[in-house]
Curated annotation (Swiss-Prot):
Cofactor: Mg(2+)
DDXXD motif, short sequence motif: residues: 91-95
Comp. bias (Low complexity): 574-586
Protein name as annotated: Delta(6)-protoilludene synthase
């Protein structure tokens, strides 16, 4: 590196980390042919605006593939070109997404890889069809082992992109070691290396030999450092350098960009020395396997050279200044990019997934119930099986990736099943997700719902959903998915009443009614503008059907006076039939129809959700839209009155509840 006298605050020097690298630059002879075919394939999906497509083409990701796969057959090189284009379509679009949206995107791509011969559904984000057609062509020139390793490593790559988005959403800056651990997947090298095996059948004990594992890691780390050295200037200009080792080294080492460059250059030199000292040290197996191993390691070394050559030959990082930078290696620090340029590369029609949470907001909007499912127990169901069935059904019906769930709130009538957490754990662990907070609450179903909502709205939220499971064997169970941008929004105002303990069954009815009026009174003091005269139903968590409609009894406009009897309990003017029925004309009974299907539900932990499910299925979505609904929850004299608002279309939930 040049002397420090030449360094200034507005320019920096990129060291030549491969000056003594023994692999020379080479290019696949089918480069031009593959470039034309792959570019046409990528462009037909309209992933970018016309202006951005032109810039995308100047980056020439086909050149990167043709440098990396210089010695491979033309058909494999074409697949490599398609892969590089797919990588950078993913990179450009997910950089503008929040973590939840990236996870939705990832689910589509993974599904496409597993169904390469099945056209994607109409209206789905285009990335699904891009990934499907890529892999449909890719499997034609890759053997079974290479195919398996590609799908495994590409899936890992995609999940790491979600992690990167989570870091971005939380403005998280990792230390260098933690960053390298994540970046080894986000750089996409592992699936790229799978193409080197296109005609090989390396046994797992050879492929995962400790030395070959280290050679792969050292090669990947050199790719990371080389890429970040060249991409830093563009990324710092966009304010997107939180996932770049130069920025992280500056923070960790408390230095400026020049000090960080020295730090990273030394890291690269150490890695190169390790690779060159060990790449010929693999033990011997069979002549065929030895030949494959030698060719594979040669491919790793060539990849390091290819990435460096492409970085200084395409317009990706240095645009029209690429030849000067290649010769001199001095880079002028770019000023911050205008905000309207940060997403201009993506046309509005191609911003395929709407972000769930805008990073500029302090907390997510419209937090509530995103999805809902219920289950009626049979005589053969035990509670653990019932819980797994219901949660699994929710995930399946709404096509929810278990990895996108970060919290479980379990509400049960009695804390009689301490192993329910372990039963539910398997539904997530089988998908590779053991990073799930799990909390058990007894009796009061709204506690789980409020806890889940508070988590989503807190600084601890990591961008994933929460699931609230509630119920018991006698009344039925439910599972609710809680997250932002929900069609059923739980309003923040709550009225809570902590009454006297219930000593007997005879006291329960009076305590229930007293708690209803007291909690509603507290609610109105906090939210006086709320009115039940809007025509919306009122849902009550009712221990029996004899409690009837809470619209009656002067329970309008906060009139809770004149209803207490000599025992201090609130009496009702009975206007309720002896049983609930779907034919009743009172809208209040719509919320209690499900009670009839499950028998006379006691103070079951899941009855609020079962009543809500009844409301959604029995009232047309267009009628419910925009309505505010009062909800009352009660458990052993502890009660809460709160409101929910139907902020979106409930038709999907309605359809799935009836499925």
């Amino acid at each position: 590196m040049p002397g420090s006298a030449n360094w200034t605050a507005d320019r920096f020097y990129i060291p030549d980390t491969l000056a003594n690298w023994p692999w020379p630059r080479a290019i696949n002879p089918a480069y031009e042919e593959c470039k034309a075919a792959s570019a046409a394939w990528c462009e037909k999906y309209g992933a970018f605006s016309a202006r951005a497509q032109k810039a995308f083409n100047l980056c020439d990701f086909n050149l990167l593939a043709s440098l990396a796969y210089a010695g491979l057959p033309a058909d494999v090189n074409r697949v490599g070109c398609d892969l590089m284009n797919l990588f950078f379509v993913v990179d450009e679009h997910t950089d503008a997404m929040d973590a939840r949206s990236v996870q939705d995107w990832v689910d589509i791509v993974v599904d496409a890889l597993h169904h390469p011969h099945t056209p994607r559904p109409a209206g789905e984000p285009k990335v699904g069809e891009i990934a499907r057609t890529f892999w449909e062509n890719g499997i034609k020139c890759m053997g079974p082992t290479a195919q398996r390793r590609f799908v495994e490593t590409f899936t890992t790559y995609l999940q790491s992109v979600v992690t990167q988005a989570q870091d971005r959403d939380k403005h998280l800056f990792r230390d260098v070691d933690s960053y390298m651990e994540v970046r080894r997947d986000t750089i996409g090298a592992k699936p790229s290396f799978a193409l080197l095996e296109h005609d090989m059948e390396l046994p797992d004990d050879v492929f995962y030999h400790p030395l070959l594992e280290k050679l792969r890691e050292w090669a990947i780390d050199m790719l990371i450092l080389g890429n970040d050295l060249c991409s830093y200037n563009v990324e710092q200009s966009r304010g997107d350098d939180g996932h770049n080792i130069i920025r992280l080294a500056m923070l960790q080492e408390n230095t400026n960009v020049h000090g960080a460059l020295r730090f990273v250059s030394k890291m690269h030199d150490d890695l190169a020395e390790k690779f060159l000292s060990n790449y010929q040290g693999m033990p011997s197996f069979t002549p065929q396997i030895d030949a494959w191993v030698t060719r594979y390691i040669d491919g790793l070394g060539n990849w390091v050279r290819a990435n460096d050559s492409w970085s200084f030959e395409s317009w990706r990082y240095f645009k029209g200044d690429v030849l000067r930078v290649q010769a001199e290696r001095w880079v002028e620090l770019l000023p911050p990019a205008p905000k309207d340029e940060l997403t201009s590369s993506i046309p509005p029609e191609s911003r395929w997934i709407k972000p769930a949470v805008e990073p500029s907001r302090a907390r997510p909007n419209n937090v509530g119930i995103v999805a809902l499912d219920t289950y009626t127990p049979t005589s053969e169901d035990d509670f653990q099986t019932l819980a797994v069935k219901t949660v699994s059904s929710l995930l399946s019906k709404y096509n929810i990736n278990p990895v996108s769930v970060g919290r479980l709130d379990i509400c049960i009538e009695r804390a009689a099943d301490p192993y329910i957490i372990y039963a539910l754990r398997d539904a997530f662990a089988s998908a590779g997700n053991t990073d799930v907070e799990a909390i058990v609450s007894s009796s009061k179903s709204v506690v789980g719902l409020f806890n889940a909502i508070n988590w989503v709205e807190s600084s601890s939220w990591d961008g994933r959903y929460a699931i609230v499971f509630a119920g018991d064997l006698s009344s039925g169970v439910s599972a609710a998915l809680v997250g932002p941008d929900a069609p059923i929004v739980v309003e923040p105002t709550r009225g809570t009443y902590l009454g006297d303990p219930i000593a007997s069954t005879d006291e329960a009815q009076g305590s229930y009614i007293d708690s209803l009026f007291q909690s509603y009174s507290h609610y109105r003091k906090k939210h006086p503008q709320f009115s039940k005269t809007s025509g919306a139903p009122n849902g009550a968590h009712t221990p029996t059907t004899t409690n009837g409609s809470i619209k009656s009894n002067g329970f309008v406009s906060g009139d809770t006076n004149g209803h207490a009897n000599g025992n201090g309990h609130v009496q009702t003017r009975s206007s309720t039939p002896s049983s609930s029925s779907s034919s009743t004309s009172s809208p209040s009974f719509d919320y209690m129809i499900l009670h009839d299907r499950h028998g006379k539900i006691p103070t079951g932990a899941g009855s609020i959700y079962l009543g809500l499910a009844s409301l959604i299925t029995d009232i047309a979505p267009e009628t419910l839209a925009g309505k505010s609904i009062g909800v009352f929850g009660f458990a052993n004299s502890t009660s809460t009155f709160f409101g929910i608002r139907v902020a979106g279309d409930c038709s999907v939930i309605c359809k799935q509840l009836q499925a």
